[in-house]
């Protein structure tokens, strides 16, 4: 009896910063597309894709809070990084919740055009859940990762406002709430990569 050949190993996930850049580029393309006039069906699909993206970013960001820097102790994650990233994840999920019940999530509809910017954005955000499962890298890569997420958040906030143009009144209110929530997420992300201030030290000789 011959043995079956072993399945090829799965490719390693992309580096967190590479994944974050791909999401940022997809968010920019989607925001540009959603700023154009669209049919009611396309508008519903765009809002659903925004919902799915926010949900998956929230899930992925919770895992990014466990980022481990490679190298030696002189290259640590910034002080308070896990807490600020976790707070940003809560903001993403809260903005997602603000759309829950207003429109059913259809962001990964199998019949959607795979080349549509919103569909590509959904897949990019979904990929982060795997890519950031056990995140590690240098502190420079961490800084790039977070800055790319900040850019993504900015694009999504602009997209939410664009989508209010053709939205019914109730949905428009919720989309504006998304914009506010993403502004809060940006604040948390920027705090996550700020260089901590100097530690409080005992005064040296001759100081008061």
Regions found by a protein language model. Give the residues of each.
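Long, low-complexity intrinsically disordered regions
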Residues: 1-11
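Non-Sec secretion/translocation targeting segments of pathogen effectors
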Residues: 1, 205-208
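Long, low-complexity or tandemly repetitive, helically biased scaffold regions used
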Residues: 9-11, 18-52, 56-184, 194-204
């Amino acid at each position: 009896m011959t043995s079956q050949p072993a399945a090829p190993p799965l490719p390693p996930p992309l580096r967190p910063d590479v994944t974050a850049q791909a999401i940022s580029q997809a968010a920019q393309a989607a925001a540009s597309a959603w700023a154009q006039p669209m049919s009611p069906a396309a508008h519903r699909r765009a809002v659903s894709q925004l919902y799915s993206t926010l949900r998956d970013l929230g899930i992925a960001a919770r895992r990014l809070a466990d980022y481990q820097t490679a190298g030696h102790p002189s290259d640590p994650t910034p002080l308070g990084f896990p807490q600020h990233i976790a707070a940003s994840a809560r903001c993403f999920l809260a903005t997602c919740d603000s759309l829950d019940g207003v429109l059913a999530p259809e962001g990964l509809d199998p019949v959607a055009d795979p080349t549509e910017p919103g569909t590509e954005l959904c897949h990019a955000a979904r990929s982060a859940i795997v890519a950031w499962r056990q995140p590690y890298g240098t502190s420079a890569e961490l800084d790039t990762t977070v800055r790319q997420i900040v850019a993504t958040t900015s694009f999504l906030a602009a997209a939410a406002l664009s989508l209010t143009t053709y939205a019914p009144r109730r949905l428009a209110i919720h989309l504006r709430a998304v914009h506010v929530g993403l502004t809060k997420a940006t604040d948390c992300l920027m705090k996550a990569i700020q260089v901590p201030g100097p530690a409080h030290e005992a005064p040296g000789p001759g100081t008061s």
